[in-house]
Amino acid sequence: MEYFDILTVDGLTLKGKKVAPASEPKAILCIVHGFGEHQERYTHVIDAMIAEGIAVFTFDLRGHGKSEGKRGHAKKYSYLIEDVEEFLMHARREFNDAPIILMGHSFGGHIVANFLLKKTTSEIAAAIISSPWLKLAFEPPAFKVKLAKIMANIYPAYSDKSELDVSRLSRVPEVAEAYSKDPLVLNTITAGLFP
């Protein structure tokens, strides 16, 4: 396992991790995590992929986990797309020939889908979009939606509680419990990232 840094277009340092099998990897899986979580929540996926001879790269999104930036915020949505591009270029430099599979879960799935729509690249052999955040699973109070829209234009870094119902994360109660107790998990979102 190796840790690495990614320098963003606006000067932030994002924290990443590479885990590779002992032999030359069959493929590279690049994981983009969901909103509020971080790369260390994907160790079960990493372990399964390593057992299959697949190298795995992960990173903490800006404002998440151990990466720099205001918690739960991106100054511009386009920065998230640029961050994924830098992340993929890092993985490609590590392994020149292995096919890259780009995976995004939840908000990460949202970012990956937009990356694929906005960027032209021959680097990605396949994509996995797991339970993408296409819209909120609940309807927030109307005043919060109006406030978020106003604040997104005036002060995009304004934050409020995300109101995520952790009991809906998994049918396994221990998953929700671990999420709730994880000090690197966020429970706030900024107006600039509000959908």
Q: Which residues does each predicted region cover?
A:
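Short coil/turn segments at beta-strand junctions that form active-site/ligand-binding loops
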Residues: 26, 53-54, 97-99
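Catalytic nucleophile-loop/oxyanion-hole region of alpha/beta-hydrolase
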Residues: 36-38, 65-95, 99
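Conserved alpha/beta-hydrolase
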Residues: 39, 46-70
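Short beta-strand element of the alpha/beta-hydrolase
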Residues: 26-34
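Alpha/beta-hydrolase-fold enzymes
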Residues: 107-192
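N-terminal cap/lid segment of alpha/beta-hydrolase-fold proteins
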Residues: 1-23
